[in-house]
Amino acid sequence: MSFDLRTRLDARRTAHLYRQRPLLQSPQGPHVIVDGQPLLAFCNNDYMGLANHPEVIAAWQAGAERWGVGGGASHLVIGHSTPHHELEEALAELTGRPRALLFSNGYMANLGAVTALVGQGDTVLEDRLNHASLLDAGLLSGARFSRYLHNDAGSLNARLEKAVGDTLVVTDGVFSMDGDIADLPALAQAAKAKGAWLMVDDAHGFGPLGANGAGIVEHFGLSMEDVPVLVGTLGKSFGTSGAFVAGSEELIETLIQFARPYIYTTSQPPALACATLKSLQLLRSEHWRREHLASLIGQFRRGAEQLGLQLMDSFTPIQPIMIGDAGRALRLSQLLRERGLLVTAIRPPTVPAGSARLRVTLSAAHSEADVQLLLEALEQCYPLLDASESTEPVHA
């Protein structure tokens, strides 16, 4: 018996679900070169426009001169350097919590936190639309795992009634494919009433949300008692790479002792932490970035609604255009690309069957003119969906 990989791949192609990697040949930003083609991109997560900021680049260069280019060891051996520690302290200050702990990426942070906190005999309850890393973490934890209806505190309450052992309620802060935000006050109230802990992965909330960019917890004015476990990523609004968990002294010490994805990996380059310290400073001080981004979101939504496009209930930089059929979503993405715009088609299994969409993401680095170009292209391209066959584009 052998692995029949070709049949699996062919099935993906037939269902318009086959994925290919675009080759980015320029720095990240609104104006990019992909596979040799200049494009105006609306598909990255650089919400604050810091991924190519000259001060962040200079901080990385200076960090490399001072600290070298590699972490060299795991944090618990000799890989925890001064820049790592300073960044953890700055992230703790941003979130208003005693401690923060750096991870190499968001997947590892989520996996590490969930599996360190619950196991056999415990319960994990997750929103059914959570990010794949959270769902994987729940399954791999060994705890009893159940998903409640999307953003539905009543559905969560019904599952809390059946929970056993230590119970961890897990949700995205901003849902990455829909752009809506979790009803944290209701979820926190439900969790606390049953003695459960609430864990929030706010990967897409840090930066755009909150008066100081501290995310959805700041947006709702909640405390560490409401949300004991707060996760953030550094590869989106911070413009660099990595992730963190913020919480109490006891939580962070527990993760240091028991979070295997933290313990058994080499630390990120110290120079990267230097760059993130600079981007964090810019995120907190340059409030115009959040204000400009909010203005662009409003501009896009008004224009898209005038065109009759079906949007999701989102005031975040994630603005999906619902299409439904995967082939039609691919076709619209290709039509836009032919006009010099890059907007990714999102298809199953990333989203449920029948809910394929174009996922527009906006950045503080975009201009009003950029958004207007997108709206004009959508006005031209959307009617063409019914006038042509759905074909598989080169990339989507």
Curated annotation (Swiss-Prot):
Pathway: Cofactor biosynthesis; biotin biosynthesis. Keywords: Biotin biosynthesis, Pyridoxal phosphate, Transferase. InterPro entries: Aminotrans_II_pyridoxalP_BS, Aminotransferase_I/II_large, AON_synthase_class-II, AONS_Archaea/Proteobacteria, AONS_Proteobacteria, PyrdxlP-dep_Trfase, PyrdxlP-dep_Trfase_major, PyrdxlP-dep_Trfase_small. One of its GO terms (molecular function) is pyridoxal phosphate binding. CDD domains: KBL_like. Its EC number is 2.3.1.47. It catalyses: 6-carboxyhexanoyl-[ACP] + L-alanine + H(+) = (8S)-8-amino-7-oxononanoate + holo-[ACP] + CO2. Pyridoxal 5'-phosphate binds at residues 106-107, 176, 204, 233. The modification N6-(pyridoxal phosphate)lysine is found at residue 236. Catalyzes the decarboxylative condensation of pimeloyl-[acyl-carrier protein] and L-alanine to produce 8-amino-7-oxononanoate (AON), [acyl-carrier protein], and carbon dioxide. Homodimer. This is 8-amino-7-oxononanoate synthase.
